[in-house]
């Protein structure tokens, strides 16, 4: 079983950083599920795993769409009724025409909308500490790059979902980009967050 220490990377980040402490707990649970064990200290660790994370600037895309305008488009039918009134040698005639309107799409209106999205990322890079102690060489054992895009700009909300999505692939080579779709209430996310598992959610093997 490989032991590890998890360290932050990025300007101004330390192991005492509150956000790192929160995020590292998610990563540690994911690594434990993959068979890794958190080392008691740096000297006893087999791997030093560096965690980088961040979120990009919002990107807004605009689009145009049309909506139908409903209304009267014509006359479907007409009905005419008449009356004849006779007074002696004189008669009058009157008539009434009733039109039944026809309704449908009489045109379209143009509108504009927009979508704002954020790109979120988390990078995990594992270095071989045993080799470093013996040969003073920095050897990367494995690296996992996680990226997601969506409407949420709250990295704290999205981060555990990203880690849960990558959990099955930590420490292995996928050979390609892997796309994973998860929701906040999916089992891997609940496990990474350390939340109680509701009844009815069976444990899935990774």
Predicted regions and their residues:
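Envelope-exposed proteins and targeting segments
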Residues: 2, 27, 34, 45-47, ...
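General N-terminal targeting signals
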Residues: 23, 55, 66-68, 157-159, ...
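Low-complexity, flexible helical/coil segments
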Residues: 38-44, 84-90, 160-162, 178-185
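Surface-exposed short loop/turn segments
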Residues: 51-134
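Generic structural hydrophobic/aromatic packing signal, biased to beta-strands
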Residues: 6, 49-51, 124, 166
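A structural detector for beta-sheet-dominated domains
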Residues: 7-9, 52, 87, 149
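A structural "domain/chain start" motif
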Residues: 1-34, 39-45, 56-63, 181, ...
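C-terminal/domain-edge helix-coil "capping" segments
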Residues: 101-206
């Amino acid at each position: 079983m490989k032991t590890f220490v998890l360290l932050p990377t990025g300007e101004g980040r330390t192991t005492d950083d509150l956000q790192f402490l929160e995020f590292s707990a998610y990563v540690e649970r994911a690594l434990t599920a993959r068979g890794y064990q958190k080392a008691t200290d740096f000297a006893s660790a087999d791997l030093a795993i560096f965690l980088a994370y961040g979120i990009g600037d919002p990107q807004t895309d605009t689009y145009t769409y049309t909506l139908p305008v409903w209304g009267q488009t014509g006359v479907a039918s007409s009905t005419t009724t008449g009356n004849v009134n006779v007074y002696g040698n004189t008669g009058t005639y009157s008539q009434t025409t009733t039109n039944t309107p026809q309704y449908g799409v009489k045109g379209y209106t143009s509108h504009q909308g927009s979508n704002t999205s954020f790109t979120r990322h988390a990078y995990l890079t594992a270095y071989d500490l045993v080799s470093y102690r013996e040969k003073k060489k920095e050897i990367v054992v494995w690296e996992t790059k996680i990226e997601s895009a969506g409407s949420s700009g709250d990295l704290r909300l999205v981060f555990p979902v990203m880690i849960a999505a990558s959990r099955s692939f930590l420490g292995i080579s996928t050979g390609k980009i892997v796309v994973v779709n998860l929701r906040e209430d999916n089992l891997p996310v609940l496990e990474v967050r350390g939340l109680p598992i509701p009844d009815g959610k069976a444990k899935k093997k990774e």
